Amino acid sequence: KKNKYGFYEIRFESIGGLGANVTGKILGEAGVLGEGFNGSSFSSYGSEKKGTPVKTFIRFCGPDHPVYINSPVEEPHLLAIFHERLIAYGDVMLGINHGATVVVNSKKSPEELRPMLKMPAGTIGVIDALKIAIEEKTRINMVMLGAIVRALGFINLDVVKKIAGETFGAKYAHLMEYNIRGLDRGFKEI
């Protein structure tokens, strides 16, 4: 799927401290370096502290198509909501069309979330990222990344693992086993 400009667009809605920014960077690099797409990834956040809203934007297109837009993603093909409470804010669901996929970190079922999201059509994927992160001693963002990769369907999980290893390996090599388990469970359990 592409929009009228030739891009597949993704938006993450999160809270500072949950790792959406680094998740977007890993996903963007996996698409560009691992899968051969052209792409971009950037985040928008206020005061760079835990608890404040964070939005991450990712665009992919074919290798022969330049990425010439740096504006926020307004009509994502995939929306990932890193904290269920963000649903209460009206702008989280802005631009979601009937064919969109929404991935939510929640204990609720897709049927329970659909009216909350005011989403009459489209695909809702749910992952209890907090529970899995606690069980696997990792962060929510790694579990969400696995779920997002599964929902996308066009980025290889092994490529994401490789990029995550390169991102965290030098500084946090002792945590990579936990991060990989979180990625795997996010991918399998959405």
Where are the predicted features?
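Active-site cofactor/cluster-binding pocket
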Residues: 1-190
